[in-house]
Amino acid sequence: GFHGDHHSLVIDQPEAEHYRDVPEASAALVPLGALVGARSGDKGGAANVGFWVPELGDGLADLRYSWFESWLTADRVKDLLPEADPLGIDLYRLPNLRAINVVIHGLLGRGVAETNRLDPQAKGLGEQFRARLIRLPSDLIPDIALPLSEDVV
């Protein structure tokens, strides 16, 4: 089955421009939502979050996606959402859409009727992720510079 594995789906994808690694000193502290949009929901006991990098008209969307695609891993999802730590996480990468779909198996227990989560259908989960502060290369999000904190993912 697919549970617990990591998957990528690439169909007729042109070679993407890849973002280089940047030194920590050139990173800015921003909410994840400054980089991506998100929509989330449920499918049985699994929570589903779709992230996408929008086109902002500055020509950096492909580079932002390249950085985000290398940054977002199952372990990073667990860092951003600690209650997902013991759960299976699948990542489905959709480069043509500059999007990544994340499935967190078992986050909702056996489903909406049997979970005690405050957000039983995971409708707010995408915004919960978008509110988390991350270190982003400052040249990908211009004019944002906050002092870095040690407790940032």
Task: Please annotate each region the language model reported.
Residues 33, 65-69, 78, 130:
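Generic detector of well-ordered alpha-helical segments enriched in charged/polar residues
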Residues 90, 97, 107-108, 119-121:
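Membrane-embedded alpha-helical signal segments
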Residues 1-47, 111, 116-153:
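C-terminal amphipathic alpha-helical interaction region
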Residues 1-23, 27-30, 43, 47, ...:
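C-terminal non-catalytic interaction/assembly regions of soluble proteins
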Residues 57-69, 110-115:
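Short, conserved charged micro-motifs
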